């Protein structure tokens, strides 16, 4: 698997579709309305921004799922915006996230309720450093559980895009099989490469934000959409390597 090729093609991807790129930029304008309203101290603009934010949530996750799908096919085309399909896909992504977060949320409440109810006794019966260490372990356990399921969710979303099937994306054992077929070392290399790329883009973003008056808008409406397009397309390209081990896709 050529990780450098995946990253290189992903970086080029938004700029091969300059005619359609404004579609994403316009969508991201929706989330800029609330801070603009706050800056103007205008409650009407803030209200419009709240409505626009919900529209954003209904459309954008589904649209980026479509970009992942394009990446799995290794196509260079930016998908056209179909409102109905984007809303349907956004709902599927939301359901997927809710299901995959059941375990982390359950662990969070179980551990906090258990430790919380005993915290007073622990505070009196344990040395202070022991009390802090216990709470630290609880927080660490919650964090690890969350990161594991967030990682699984990442590839479940790619599976959803690839197979266009929510039930398939909810099959955790199939998602784990996909991860194994892609290869944990390949995924690790991809994550490191993407982190480096995102850090570079974030540095550029910080310079853009410093531009008076328009920097904030340029960042939200141009830099962030490009960053999201690169990340989602790259995930799709990474997942496309599952073809070589397609037995994990059996329904």
Could you describe each region identified by the protein language model?
Residues 44-72, 129-169, 207-246:
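Selective recognition of hydrophobic, aromatic-rich stretches within alpha-helical transmembrane segments
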Residues 39-40, 200-211:
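Transmembrane helix-loop junctions in multi-pass membrane proteins
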Residues 5, 9, 42, 46, ...:
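Membrane-helix interfacial "entry" motifs
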Residues 107-113, 196-200, 213-216:
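Short alpha-helical linear motifs
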Residues 29-35, 112, 119-126, 171-173, ...:
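Juxtamembrane, membrane-proximal amphipathic segments and lipid-exposed surfaces
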Residues 2-31, 82-106, 151-203, 250-251:
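Interfacial aromatic "cap" segments that immediately flank transmembrane helices
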